[in-house]
């Protein structure tokens, strides 16, 4: 259920505990993040928005307590365009790309990036919204059939995802020309679509599978000892399971970083956790040390970059599993980050916020 009010209610219940011992609060929703941005800053409790929005919170000078870590919708969209461009000999001029999106804050976040990429790369962009929940897409796919796009970039959520894949099959649109966001790229999105999903691609900021050492260790040490609480153990190693482990990695690494500064074993408050999130430096060497090699990309945050990476991989569903078909791809930072900064500057103006001087932050 996509319900922002319940997310705010959950935050209000938790914030008393969080103020005393605050790890980052994972909202798991762009809409909930928007609802909590101002409130969490007032409460001095950091929000972790891994892979989602509000995307202009990359600018920590304006949003000190909001962290769209790893990547954002706009950088993800840019990386998808780069992947398509590389598939077409580095030239998208004259191509047509449909942006099919969930008509919500989530779906709308990437529009500005797609428009910027279309202007830069000279391709035609066709925007097609889908009303929530997305289980009716007949009109949208009729339009796609009429438009005959070279690619469909897909920003779906929930039942919208399997519906789109089945609709694409029905109108004869090739699924290997569809590339979705990470909210459209889990096993739960493709398995219900059956054969209609085969060949479909999606971006991801974490890999699937059990060949990541920490995932294999969890299965062996935790579930092997009968201590796990996951009823369906086949979920271990899936995209969403590994994403949860990725969130745990970043949360624990933030606490470790904070304790390096404020005292080993110390329960951090919100301000101290905020500092830690803003000073993350998770290198490949560190990922290897904790058994998370290739689980997610390197992360290095700062006052003016609360994202820390901007990279995704593209994966393809082969009918049984997700298979990576790219290395880590970084979106066009030179194109996209000024969009964040302009949006953050406008937000600061509207809210009467004086941005921090990042040159003075350490």
Positions of predicted regions on the chain:
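Acidic helix-start/capping segments at beta-turn-to-alpha-helix junctions
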Residues: 1-4
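Extracellular/periplasmic Venus flytrap/periplasmic-binding protein
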Residues: 6, 12, 16, 55-56, ...
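Extracytoplasmic "Venus flytrap"/periplasmic binding protein-like
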Residues: 12-26, 31-49, 59-67, 146, ...
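Sec-exported extracytoplasmic/periplasmic mature domains
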Residues: 12-20, 37-45, 85-90, 115-123, ...
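Structural recognition of the beta-strand scaffold that forms the well-ordered cores
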Residues: 22-27, 46-51, 66-68, 96-101, ...
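Venus flytrap/periplasmic-binding-protein-like
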Residues: 47-49, 53-58, 133, 174-193, ...
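Extracellular/periplasmic periplasmic-binding protein-like sensory domains
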Residues: 168-248, 343
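Segments of small-molecule ligand-sensing domains
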Residues: 229-241, 252-327, 331
């Amino acid at each position: 259920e996509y319900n922002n009010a319940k997310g705010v209610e959950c935050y209000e219940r938790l914030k008393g505990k969080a103020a005393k011992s605050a790890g980052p609060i994972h909202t798991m929703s762009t809409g909930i993040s928007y609802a909590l941005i101002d409130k969490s800053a007032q409460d001095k409790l950091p929000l972790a928005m891994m892979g989602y929005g509000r995307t202009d919170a990359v600018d920590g000078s304006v949003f000190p307590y909001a962290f769209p870590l790893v990547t954002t919708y706009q950088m993800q969209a840019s990386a998808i365009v780069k992947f398509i461009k590389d598939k077409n000999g580095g030239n998208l001029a004259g191509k047509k790309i449909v942006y099919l999106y969930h008509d919500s804050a989530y779906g709308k976040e990437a529009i500005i990036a797609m428009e910027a990429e279309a202007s830069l790369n000279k391709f035609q962009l066709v925007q097609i919204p889908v009303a929530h929940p997305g289980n009716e897409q007949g009109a949208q796919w009729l339009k796609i059939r009429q438009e005959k796009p070279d690619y469909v970039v897909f920003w779906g959520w929930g039942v919208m995802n399997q519906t789109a894949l089945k609709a694409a099959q029905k109108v004869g649109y090739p699924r290997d020309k569809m590339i979705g966001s990470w909210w459209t790229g889990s096993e739960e999105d493709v398995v219900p679509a059956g054969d209609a999903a085969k060949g479909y691609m999606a971006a991801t900021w974490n890999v699937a599978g059990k060949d990541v050492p920490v995932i294999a260790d969890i299965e062996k040490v935790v579930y092997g000892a009968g201590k796990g609480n996951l009823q369906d153990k086949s979920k271990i190693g899936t995209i969403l399971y590994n994403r949860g482990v990725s969130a745990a990695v970043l949360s624990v690494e933030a606490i470790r970083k904070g304790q390096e500064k404020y005292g080993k074993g110390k329960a951090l408050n919100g301000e101290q956790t905020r500092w830690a999130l803003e000073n993350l430096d998770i290198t490949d060497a560190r990922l290897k040390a904790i058994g998370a090699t290739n689980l997610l990309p390197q992360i290095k945050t700062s006052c003016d970059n609360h994202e820390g990476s901007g990279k995704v991989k593209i994966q393809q569903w082969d009918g049984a599993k997700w298979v990576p078909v790219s290395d880590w791809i970084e979106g066009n930072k030179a194109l996209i980050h000024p969009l964040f900064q302009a949006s953050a500057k406008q937000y600061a103006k509207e809210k009467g916020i004086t941005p921090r001087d990042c040159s003075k932050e350490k």
